[in-house]
C-alpha cells in the first residue's frame, strides 16, 4: 500500500509539473518572439501532416516574416529549409524553375549570414570571458592576443554584406568591451552610449531578459566609476531601476538590484560620503545582504568585498576583518573571479595592520606566483606599502611617508583616463 501510494504521488507530481510548464509556455508565447515563431512553425507542420499544404505554406510565411523582422537568423534558416521541403512534397505546383532557384539562393544567403553571425558571437564570447575572468591587459602577450581578436572582428565586419540591428549590436558590444578591457574608459563610454541609443531606437529588439542591454549599462557605469565621473552615474543607475520595473525573471531582477546597490555604494564611497554609504547599506541589509545565497557567486563576492571596503572607510577595522574572514572561508569557490584578487590585496592591508607580517609576506609571494605575467602597478604599490609595516608611531613621520607615496597613488588613479592606451579599431 505504501509503495502504491508513493507511485500515485509521483504521478500526481509529474502531471502537475506538466500543467505548470504548459501554462508557462503559453504565457511566454504572448511576449516572446522566438516562442511565437516556434508556435507558428509547429502549426504549419501540423497542417502539412494533415495534407493542407496551402495553409501550411501560408502559416510558414507568417513565421518567416516574423523571423526576418526580428533577425532570428537560425530560425529563418530552418523556416526556409522547411519551405523547400513543403514545396518538394507538393511537386512545386505553380512554381517556375527560376522561383525555385531564387528560394535556394535565399537559403544559401541565410546560411552565409548565420555563419558570419555565429563567428561574430564567438569572438564576442571570448572577449567577454576574458573580461569576466581576467584582469585588465598588462603584458605585451595579452595586448597582442587582444589585438588579434579585434582584427578578426574587423575582418568579419568588412566582409559582411548584411547590415542590421544584430550586426550593429554585436559590433558595438565587442568594441565597448575591448576598450573597457584595455583601460580606455572614455572610448568605452562613447561606444556604450551609442549602443544604448541603438536599443532605445529599437525597443522591440531587446531580449527577455535584456542581457545585452544590461551589459551596456553596466559597462557605462564601470567606465564612469573608473574614470571618476561620479556625477554622471545616477542617470545610468536610473536605467537599471527601470529594468526592475518590467516583467523579467526574478533571478535577473535580483542581479540588477544588486548592481544598483553596488554602483550607488561605490559612488558614495569614492565621493567621501561615508555616512550616506552606511545608510544605503542599512536600507539593503535585510533585502540583499541577508539573502546573498540568492545571488550568483561573482555577485556574492562583489557584495561582500563592498562591505569590507565600507567598514574600512568608516574606521571599523574589526568588522572589516570579520567580513573578510567570510570571504576567505569560502575558499576556492571565488578563486577564479578577478574580484578575488582584489580581496586578497585588501586582506593584505588588514593582516599587516594586525601585525601579522609573516602571513603578509607569504601572501605577497603567493599572489606573485598565481599569475604567469608581472604584477600590476596597483599590486606593486600595495606590496610596497605592506612591507613598510609597522608604520611609524609619530604623526609627522606618517605624514612624510604618505607624501612619498602620494605621487604614485595619484599617477595610478589617472593612468587610464588621461590618454587612450590602445588604438581604436
Roles of regions detected by a PLM:
Residues 38, 42, 75, 82, ...:
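"A position-specific structural signal for the A-helix of alpha-solenoid helical repeats
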Amino acid at each position: 500500500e505504501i509503495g502504491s501510494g508513493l507511485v500515485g504521488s509521483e504521478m500526481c507530481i509529474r502531471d502537475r509539473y506538466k500543467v505548470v510548464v504548459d501554462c508557462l509556455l503559453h504565457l511566454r508565447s504572448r511576449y516572446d518572439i522566438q516562442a511565437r515563431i516556434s508556435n507558428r512553425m509547429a502549426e504549419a507542420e501540423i497542417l502539412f501532416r494533415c495534407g493542407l499544404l496551402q495553409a501550411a505554406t501560408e502559416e510558414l510565411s507568417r513565421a518567416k516574416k516574423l523571423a526576418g523582422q526580428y533577425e532570428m537568423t537560425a530560425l529563418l534558416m530552418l523556416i526556409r529549409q522547411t519551405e523547400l521541403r513543403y514545396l518538394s512534397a507538393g511537386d512545386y505546383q505553380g512554381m517556375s524553375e527560376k522561383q525555385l532557384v531564387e528560394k535556394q539562393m535565399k537559403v544559401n544567403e541565410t546560411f552565409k549570414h548565420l555563419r558570419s553571425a555565429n563567428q561574430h558571437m564567438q569572438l564576442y564570447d571570448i572577449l567577454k570571458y576574458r573580461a569576466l575572468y581576467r584582469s585588465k591587459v598588462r603584458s605585451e602577450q595579452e595586448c597582442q592576443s587582444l589585438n588579434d581578436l579585434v582584427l578578426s572582428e574587423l575582418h568579419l565586419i568588412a566582409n559582411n554584406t548584411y547590415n542590421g540591428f544584430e550586426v550593429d549590436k554585436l559590433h558595438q558590444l565587442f568594441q565597448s568591451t575591448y576598450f573597457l578591457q584595455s583601460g580606455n574608459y572614455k572610448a568605452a563610454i562613447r561606444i556604450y552610449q551609442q549602443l544604448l541609443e541603438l536599443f532605445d531606437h529599437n525597443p522591440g529588439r531587446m531580449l527577455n531578459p535584456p542581457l545585452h542591454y544590461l551589459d551596456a549599462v553596466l559597462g557605462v557605469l564601470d567606465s564612469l566609476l573608473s574614470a571618476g565621473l561620479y556625477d554622471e552615474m545616477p542617470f545610468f543607475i536610473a536605467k537599471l531601476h527601470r529594468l526592475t520595473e518590467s516583467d523579467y525573471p526574478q533571478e535577473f531582477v535580483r542581479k540588477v538590484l544588486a548592481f544598483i546597490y553596488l554602483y550607488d555604494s561605490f559612488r558614495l564611497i569614492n565621493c567621501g560620503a561615508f555616512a550616506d554609504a552606511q545608510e544605503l547599506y542599512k536600507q539593503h541589509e535585510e533585502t540583499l545582504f541577508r539573502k546573498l545565497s540568492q545571488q550568483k557567486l561573482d555577485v556574492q563576492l562583489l557584495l561582500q568585498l563592498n562591505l569590507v571596503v565600507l567598514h574600512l572607510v568608516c574606521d571599523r577595522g574589526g568588522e572589516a576583518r570579520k567580513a573578510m574572514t567570510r570571504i576567505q572561508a569560502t575558499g576556492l569557490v571565488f578563486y577564479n573571479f578577478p574580484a578575488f584578487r582584489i580581496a586578497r590585496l585588501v586582506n593584505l592591508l588588514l593582516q599587516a595592520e594586525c601585525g601579522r607580517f609573516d602571513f603578509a609576506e607569504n601572501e605577497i609571494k603567493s599572489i606573485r606566483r598565481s599569475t604567469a605575467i608581472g604584477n600590476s602597478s596597483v599590486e606593486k604599490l600595495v606590496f610596497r606599502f605592506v612591507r613598510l609595516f609597522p608604520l611609524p608611531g609619530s604623526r609627522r613621520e606618517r605624514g612624510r611617508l604618505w607624501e612619498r607615496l602620494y605621487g604614485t597613488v595619484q599617477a595610478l588613479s589617472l593612468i587610464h583616463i588621461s590618454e587612450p592606451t590602445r588604438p581604436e579599431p
